[in-house]
Swiss-Prot record:
UniProt xrefs under NCBIfam families: PRK06508.1
Organism: Agrobacterium fabrum (strain C58 / ATCC 33970)
InterPro entries per UniProt: ACP, ACP-like_sf, PP-bd_ACP, Ppantetheine_attach_site
Keyword terms: Cytoplasm, Fatty acid biosynthesis, Fatty acid metabolism, Lipid A biosynthesis, Lipid biosynthesis, Lipid metabolism, Phosphopantetheine, Phosphoprotein
Pfam families assigned: PP-binding
Domain Carrier: 4-90
Cellular compartment(s): Cytoplasm
Gene3D superfamilies to which the protein is assigned, alphabetical: ACP-like
Signal peptide start-end: none
A biological-process GO annotation: lipid A biosynthetic process
Lineage summary: Bacteria, Pseudomonadati, Pseudomonadota, Alphaproteobacteria, Hyphomicrobiales
Protein name: Acyl carrier protein AcpXL
Function comment: Carrier of the growing fatty acid chain in fatty acid biosynthesis. Is involved in the transfer of long hydroxylated fatty acids to lipid A.
Pathway(s): Glycolipid biosynthesis; KDO(2)-lipid A biosynthesis
Main location: cytoplasm
Length: 94
């Protein structure tokens, strides 16, 4: 599955979970800054992504890395980057 197909599924999940208009969700959207998704909704989204793709997003690790200043929030929370991470996790799973 390419990033486009991954993005389409993730965008659908976000739209369903947080009642955001699907048309407003783009690969450049930042889930928190642009879409205004709160942490509770984001947990629901991550859970749905895990289920959809059969992976486990290491959200605690990502949050810790952001909080420690190791990476910017864009690294994980801009959709095109999030989708790339999802594809990496799926590839690693085999």
């Amino acid at each position: 599955m390419g990033v486009t197909a991954t993005f389409d599924k993730v965008a659908d999940i976000i739209a369903e979970t947080s009642e955001i208009d699907r048309e407003t969700i783009t690969p450049e959207s930042h889930t928190i800054d642009d879409l205004g998704i709160d942490s509770l909704d984001f947990l629901d989204i991550v859970f749905a992504i895990d289920k959809e793709f059969g992976i486990k997003i290491p959200l605690e690790q990502w949050t810790q890395e952001v909080n420690e200043g190791k990476v910017s929030t864009e690294e994980y929370f801009v959709l095109k980057n999030l989708c790339a991470k999802i594809d990496e996790l799926r590839a690693a799973k085999g």
